[in-house]
């Protein structure tokens, strides 16, 4: 379920600033046509920080209802009780698993982190994937904590987005005795992480080129490293352009440019700069996504 390519879907909004149900369904269909293995909703790319609890649940419900691939629901919070509530809802809605970010801002110690994730895992039966993205949370989940959490039956993997390939390697090394998967949280590190035993990527760029990212991962898994490398370098400029500003600012703009369903950003996020918009458009043209 957590192997292969899972796009971290954006959350499209209507002009009235409500969830664009039709747009979300179309985006899921577009991803599925690109042969992704699953989809992730309500993550960083999905602007979960500015979704109300009701909206969060609504997005999960829509995705589970319409998707033909496994749905992984972002259910993290810096409030343990809220994370439990969201994860329980994901399970009841029929999500295949939950992606749980480390508590942001609070910065709990080792005992607090372990207790937080254990409490969430014990409240449900669906698989849990940890989400480590210190650039957004302000705290890097330590190798010691990850190794301990990997022993919990339904904590089955981690989205590793620290950008530290050596740390990803150590996580894989330390959890070899557990059925624990490491997936890349950085599009540009997908191929390097897979080369050391990672299982795929939870991807931003797959919102717009799901087929290319799926082909990259499949080529590597089939032993065709030359094709995987070719695809890596083919989409690398777009990946860099998607992170010239805070995610999901560039990816939403890119999707709107090529006619996909993204809608606006919720404040305090603001539209992309003219300079970065030009760079993004040029990258899309180079890939044939934009005329």
Curated annotation (Swiss-Prot):
CDD domains: DHDPS
Residue sites binding pyruvate per the record: 45, 202
Entry EC number(s): 4.3.3.7
Any Pfam family hit: DHDPS
Alphabetized InterPro entries for the sequence: Aldolase_TIM, DapA, DapA-like, Schiff_base-form_aldolases_AS, Schiff_base-form_aldolases_CS
Site features described as Part of a proton relay during catalysis, chain residue numbers: 44, 105
Localization annotation: Cytoplasm
Catalytic activity: L-aspartate 4-semialdehyde + pyruvate = (2S,4S)-4-hydroxy-2,3,4,5-tetrahydrodipicolinate + H2O + H(+)
Role according to the record: Catalyzes the condensation of (S)-aspartate-beta-semialdehyde [(S)-ASA] and pyruvate to 4-hydroxy-tetrahydrodipicolinate (HTPA).
HAMAP family (UniProt xref): DapA
Protein name in UniProt: 4-hydroxy-tetrahydrodipicolinate synthase
Record organism: Methanococcoides burtonii (strain DSM 6242 / NBRC 107633 / OCM 468 / ACE-M)
Lineage, opening ranks: Archaea, Methanobacteriati, Methanobacteriota, Stenosarchaea group, Methanomicrobia
């Amino acid at each position: 379920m957590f192997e292969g390519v899972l796009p971290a879907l954006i959350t499209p909004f209507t002009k009235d600033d409500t969830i664009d149900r039709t747009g979300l369904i179309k985006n899921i269909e577009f991803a599925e046509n690109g042969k992704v293995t699953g989809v992730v909703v309500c993550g960083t790319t999905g602007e979960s920080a500015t979704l109300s609890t009701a909206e969060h649940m609504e997005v999960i419900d829509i995705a589970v209802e319409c998707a033909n691939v496994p749905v992984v629901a972002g259910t993290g919070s810096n409030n343990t009780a809220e994370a439990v509530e969201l994860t329980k809802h994901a399970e009841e809605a029929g999500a295949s698993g939950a992606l749980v970010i480390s508590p942001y801002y609070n910065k709990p110690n080792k005992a607090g982190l372990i207790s937080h994730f254990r409490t969430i895992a014990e409240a449900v039966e669906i698989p849990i994937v940890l989400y480590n993205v210190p650039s957004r949370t302000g705290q890097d989940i330590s190798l010691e904590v990850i190794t301990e959490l990997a022993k919990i039956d339904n904590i089955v993997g981690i989205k590793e987005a620290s950008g530290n390939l050596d740390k990803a390697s150590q996580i894989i090394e330390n959890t070899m005795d557990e059925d624990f998967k490491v997936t890349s949280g950085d599009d540009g590190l997908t191929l390097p992480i897979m080369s050391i035993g990672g299982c795929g990527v939870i991807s931003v760029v797959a919102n717009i080129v799901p087929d290319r990212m799926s082909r990259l991962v499949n080529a590597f898994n089939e032993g065709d490293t030359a094709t995987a490398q070719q695809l890596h370098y083919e989409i690398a400029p777009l990946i860099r352009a998607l992170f010239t500003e805070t995610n999901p600012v560039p990816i939403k703009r890119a999707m709107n440019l090529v006619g996909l369903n993204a809608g606006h950003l919720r404040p305090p996020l603001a539209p992309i700069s003219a300079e970065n918009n030009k760079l993004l458009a040029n990258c899309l043209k180079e890939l044939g996504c934009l005329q």
